[in-house]
């Protein structure tokens, strides 16, 4: 996140304009090229963890719906192998109740409409949109498991307590959320809404 936080806006725009060279779409590779990986990161880089983090960095997000699902897995730094509908709903509501995030649920969303959405309606949207698309396009990292809404593939189990995994997952989630809202803000400026 430091690279994003302290980068000049003009340089950031250039970096994201060239997707194959965008360090935010392949941060571990970027550090590797600079010979900046520490020993633990080097071990992580050589395994399946790098592939998983790369998926998180590059998963399509035309809307921000996947963020609360990823945050449910991240679980405030205690990464989970599977999440229940209740955990997804809790993460979803925590995310969309923060600030004006609720505006991103639908084009004409108001706070009154948001507050009137039932848990059942939220769950329907969670399962039919972000969960469905992570299962479909998640390169096999996200899997359907009995008794839970969605899980991670078993090969990731040894990594869920790995400090590199925890740090990288947090950075990706934080960056993707900040990038999304920065783009939303710029679009609203262009549209004359700000």
Identify the meaning behind each predicted range.
Residues 1-194:
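Intrinsically disordered, charged low-complexity linkers and terminal tails
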């Amino acid at each position: 996140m430091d690279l994003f936080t302290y980068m000049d806006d003009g340089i950031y725009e250039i970096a994201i304009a060239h997707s194959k060279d965008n360090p935010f779409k392949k941060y571990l590779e970027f550090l590797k090229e600079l010979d900046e990986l520490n020993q633990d990161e080097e071990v992580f880089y050589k395994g399946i963890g790098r592939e998983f983090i790369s998926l998180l960095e590059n998963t399509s997000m035309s809307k921000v719906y996947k963020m609360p699902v990823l945050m449910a897995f991240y679980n405030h730094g205690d990464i989970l192998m599977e999440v229940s509908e209740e955990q997804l709903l809790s993460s979803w509501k925590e995310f969309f109740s923060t600030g004006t995030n609720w505006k991103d649920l639908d084009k004409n969303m108001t706070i009154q409409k948001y507050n009137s959405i039932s848990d059942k309606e939220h769950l329907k949207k969670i399962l039919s949109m972000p969960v469905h698309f992570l299962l479909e396009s998640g390169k096999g990292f996200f899997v359907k498991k009995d008794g839970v809404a969605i899980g991670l593939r078993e090969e990731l189990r040894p990594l869920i307590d790995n400090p590199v995994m925890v740090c990288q997952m947090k950075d990706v989630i934080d960056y993707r959320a900040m990038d999304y809202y920065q783009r939303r803000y710029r679009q609203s400026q262009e549209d004359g809404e700000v």
